């Protein structure tokens, strides 16, 4: 795992104690979520509690970078915190290098702010450790009580503004999705997106029917100014095919994930 390898490569031996505490705190936490806000607090809280435990500042690359770029990071996080696109924030050491894992930094700062603004420090620690990450409202209440953001957060507007920038699938070619008379001689399938896409990331999976219904043999690459993905396919006559395009990795060049979590491509040959 390159991400994990990079994490340890950037740690000194002095940080091993902190890492052990960080991982132990994870065993005491409740729930999980694929939303940037929830997962960032979940990770950052482990760093903050570890720092309280060892009674000295922890030193990591993301904390150092984060503190030196606080304003711009906070603004970007606010735009993306209600999304499920981790690309700019978590587990991205193999792509982002020095500005990787900044969700840890933001989560740490949110927890630190919550703690500093709490009159009862013991209760604050309990709140941080026992926060239920499956409960979006509880996580949002925690954020608001932390006073990490000075201004009021308009969740509806943030989500609306983010979704305006998300790419979507316009169509597939050379036949329409769910067609039932596709020529089995076809060797290419094209997916057309609404925006120029990041060509480094793909997330295509089997449908519930599994491997036998999966027609793709290879990802050929992008064309049409990176708005069209070309897939090589191998088809047989009178057979159903289907697969799922997900937003786990597909994103625009601006870093916005696909608006649909899953898009099923389904068709049948003649």
Protein language model features and the residues they cover:
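Extracytoplasmic/secreted envelope proteins and their assembly/folding machinery
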Residues: 21, 43-50, 108-111, 125, ...
């Amino acid at each position: 795992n390159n991400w994990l390898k990079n994490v340890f490569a950037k740690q000194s031996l002095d940080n091993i104690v902190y890492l052990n505490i960080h991982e132990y705190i994870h065993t005491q936490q409740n729930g999980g979520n694929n939303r940037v806000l929830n997962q960032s607090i979940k990770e950052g809280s482990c760093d903050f509690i570890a720092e309280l435990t060892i009674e000295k500042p922890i030193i990591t690359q993301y904390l150092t970078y984060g503190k030196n770029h606080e304003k711009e990071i906070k603004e970007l996080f606010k735009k993306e915190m209600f999304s499920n696109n981790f690309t700019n924030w978590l587990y991205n050491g193999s792509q982002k290098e020095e500005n990787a894992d900044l969700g840890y930094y933001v989560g740490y700062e949110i927890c630190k702010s919550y703690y500093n603004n709490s009159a009862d420090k013991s209760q604050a620690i309990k709140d941080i450790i026992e926060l239920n990450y499956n409960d979006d409202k509880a996580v949002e209440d925690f954020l608001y009580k932390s006073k990490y953001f000075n201004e009021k957060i308009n969740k509806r507007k943030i989500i609306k503004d983010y979704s305006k920038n998300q790419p979507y699938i316009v169509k597939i070619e050379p036949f329409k999705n769910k067609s039932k008379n596709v020529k089995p001689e076809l060797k290419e399938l094209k997916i057309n997106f609404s925006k120029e896409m990041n060509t480094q990331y793909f997330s295509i999976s089997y449908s519930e029917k599994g491997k036998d219904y999966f027609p793709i043999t290879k990802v050929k690459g992008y064309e049409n100014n990176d708005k069209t993905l070309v897939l090589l396919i191998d088809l047989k006559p009178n057979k159903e095919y289907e697969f799922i395009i997900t937003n786990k990795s597909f994103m625009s060049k601006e870093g916005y994930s696909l608006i649909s979590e899953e898009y099923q491509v389904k068709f049948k040959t003649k």
